[in-house]
């Protein structure tokens, strides 16, 4: 079965800038990350997850979505997977998106994410 790419989102996050923002505004962690994501201690991993949320918003073309409506979870293999809930899931449904692809990376003080949304 052929699928159609609905959108591609790419984002880059400066790790030090995110670290400073989280230190300056402790409540920001709760606004940006789900309870499971808040357990992560490596700032590079948090930055990559924030990049994924931004990239997901770009795919959906829906500004103002709650950050916690897009979550990065790890499969048993360690591979990251994007899970959308709430208004992000509603926006994805409206676009017909049924499959997400996610790639995360961090090096040299930056974190990147690429998100692809597909429909049948």
Short names for language-model regions:
Residues 1-120:
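Core catalytic alpha/beta fold that binds nucleotide/phospho-ligands
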């Amino acid at each position: 079965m052929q699928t159609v790419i609905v959108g591609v989102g790419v984002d880059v996050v400066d790790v030090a800038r995110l670290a400073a923002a989280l230190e300056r505004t402790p409540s920001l962690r709760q606004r940006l990350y789900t309870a499971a994501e808040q357990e992560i201690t490596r700032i590079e991993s948090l930055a990559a997850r924030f990049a994924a949320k931004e990239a997901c918003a770009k795919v959906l073309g829906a500004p103002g979505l709650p950050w916690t409506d897009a979550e990065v979870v790890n499969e048993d293999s360690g591979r990251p997977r994007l899970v959308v809930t709430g208004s992000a899931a509603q926006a994805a449904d409206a676009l017909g998106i049924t499959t997400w692809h996610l790639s995360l990376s961090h090096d040299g003080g930056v974190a990147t994410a690429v998100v692809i949304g597909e429909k049948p």
